[in-house]
From Swiss-Prot:
It comes from the Bacteria. GO terms for cellular component: cytosol. SUPFAM superfamilies: P-loop containing nucleoside triphosphate hydrolases. It comes from Serratia proteamaculans (strain 568). This is Thymidylate kinase. ATP binds at G10, L11, E12, G13, A14, G15, K16, T17. PROSITE patterns: THYMIDYLATE_KINASE (PS01331). GO terms for molecular function: ATP binding; dTMP kinase activity. The gene is tmk.
Length: 212
């Protein structure tokens, strides 16, 4: 089977790390062992520097909304061109913690950046490059934030007010409904239920890929 790019998406506290581990388990059960891992923003030395600037700013100066968008896309294209595409070309599968859908939801939804502008920027920077499968872990923002707070100190994005995350979730759900490559998983269930749902979704998708 040709190598694929699989992405885990969702709000803070949705359980992306656990989901990633579950996806990897299923891939290995299907004989897929050459797997590269990425995270966004970040994933390369340059992109990690941009991640730190995005998260913390410099000497109290935080990026404006438009600067935030451009920093995210700079980090993303660096990761895609230097890590993801080369990995896929050599036959490895790539499992990513976030990708472009995050920007479309957080900046296009949460921040209120013009959605046509966001789509245009995506197409200009990434061309036709898209994940083969995206698992969107959906849960009420208040639940995710409670989980995030329980983990410890919150970053700049995690400290946003609840309405920001409600707008972000609404955009996530809107985009997921429009794209057959995005599978929505109810992440408000118990850990065992979420894990079982992810295993089922990924296994069914792999069977479809094998039969294609």
């Amino acid at each position: 089977m040709k190598s694929k790019f699989v992405v885990i998406e969702g709000l803070e506290g949705a359980g992306k790390t656990t989901a990633r581990d579950t996806v990897v388990d299923v891939l290995r059960e299907h004989g897929i062992n050459d797997i590269a891992f990425t995270r966004e923003p970040g994933g390369t030395p340059l992109a990690e520097k941009l991640r730190d600037l995005f998260k913390r700013g410099v000497e109290g100066e935080l990026p404006t909304i438009k600067a935030e968008v451009l920093m995210l896309y700079a980090a993303r294209v660096q990761l895609v061109e230097t890590v993801i595409k080369p990995a896929l070309a050599r036959g490895a599968w790539v499992v990513g913690d976030r990708h472009d859908l995050s920007s479309q939801a957080y900046q296009g939804g949460g921040r209120g950046v013009d959605q046509q502008l966001m789509a245009s920027l995506r197409d200009t920077v990434l061309g036709e490059f898209r994940p083969d499968l995206t698992l969107y872990l959906d849960l009420p923002p208040i639940v995710g934030l409670q989980r995030a707070r329980a983990r410890g100190e919150l970053d700049r994005i995690e400290q946003e007010a609840l309405p920001f995350f409600e707008r972000t979730r609404a955009r996530y759900r809107e985009l997921a409904a429009q794209d057959a490559s995005i599978i929505t998983v109810d992440a408000s269930q118990s850990l065992d239920q979420v894990t079982a749902a992810i295993r089922r979704c990924v296994s069914q998708w792999l069977q479809q890929q094998e039969g294609a």
